[in-house]
Amino acid sequence: MNNTVVITGGVSGIGLSASQLFLSRGWNVVMADFNDALGQDVHRKLSTQYGADRVAFHQCDVSDADSVNNLAEAAYQQFGHVDSVINNAGIFAKGAVHELDESTWDRVMATDVKSIFLTTKAFVPDMIERKSGTIVNTASISGLQGDYNMAVYNAAKGAVVNLVRAMALDYGKYGIRVNNVNPGPTLTPMFKSNPESVIDEFAQASPLGRLVEPDDVARTMFFLASDESAPITGENIPVSAGFEIYSGQPVQQ
C-alpha cells in the first residue's frame, strides 16, 4: 500500500515541486490549494503522468476550519489513510507594524499559523490511532531572524518555528514526528517577479553565490516525511544557501 501525503499550497512553487517529487517516489498525493483553476490544470497534468488513482486536488482555504475538514474527509475517502501532512501554504505582507492594517495582520497569521492548527486537528487524530505519521511545516529563515519591513511575516514564521517544538513534544509518544523546513530566498514564480537586479543582489549575498531552488526544499520535505529521518523531530532545518549564518557585523581586516 502506497504512503499518502497531503500538501497544502501544493500546485505552485515549492508545493508543486514537492507534489511531483512525492509522486515520483511512489506516494499518493493530495494537493490542496486556494487557486482552483491552477489546481485543476496541475491535477490533469500530473494525473496523466502518474495516474489518476494516485493524485487528487481539492480547493481549500487553509484558514477555514470547514474547508480543512472537507479536505481531510476527501483525502481519507479516496486513499483511506494519510501518512504525512506538508503544511506549505503561506502568504506574506510588507510593512512595519504601524503600517499594517488589522485585516492584513489577521490574514497572514491565519494562513501561515492558524492553518497548521487546523490541519493538525483534522489529521492528527488518525495518526494518533495508527501510532505513526509525520508533519512537515514550511517555516522560513525569516522566523529565525529579523527582516526589514516584514513584521507580520517575521511574527508568523517565528510562531511556526516554536510551534514545531511543542507539537513534537506532544505527539512524539504516538510515534508522530514534526519538523520544519526553513527556506531562504527561493526561486519561486513569486520571487522571480522581482527585478533581475534584486534577484542578483540576493544571490550575491549568499555564501554559495546562489539562491534556493524549489526542488531543494522539496527534497528536504521528502526526507523529513520519510523514514530516512526517523530519529529527527522538533527541528528547524534551514534550506537557505547559507543566508541565515551571517551575523551582519562588518568584515574585520
Residue ranges and their predicted role:
Residues 11-12:
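Conserved glycine-rich cofactor-binding loop
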Residues 86, 172, 177, 232-234:
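Short, small/polar-rich loop/turn modules that mediate ligand/substrate recognition or access, typified
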Residues 96-97, 101-106, 191, 202:
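Substrate-binding pocket helix/loop in short-chain dehydrogenase/reductase
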Residues 120, 156, 164:
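Active-site helix of classical SDR
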Residues 125, 169-173, 230:
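Alpha-helical segment proximal to the catalytic Tyr-Lys
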Residues 140:
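Residue(s) in the substrate-gating loop at a strand-loop-helix junction
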Residues 145, 233-253:
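Short C-terminal tail/terminal secondary-structure segment
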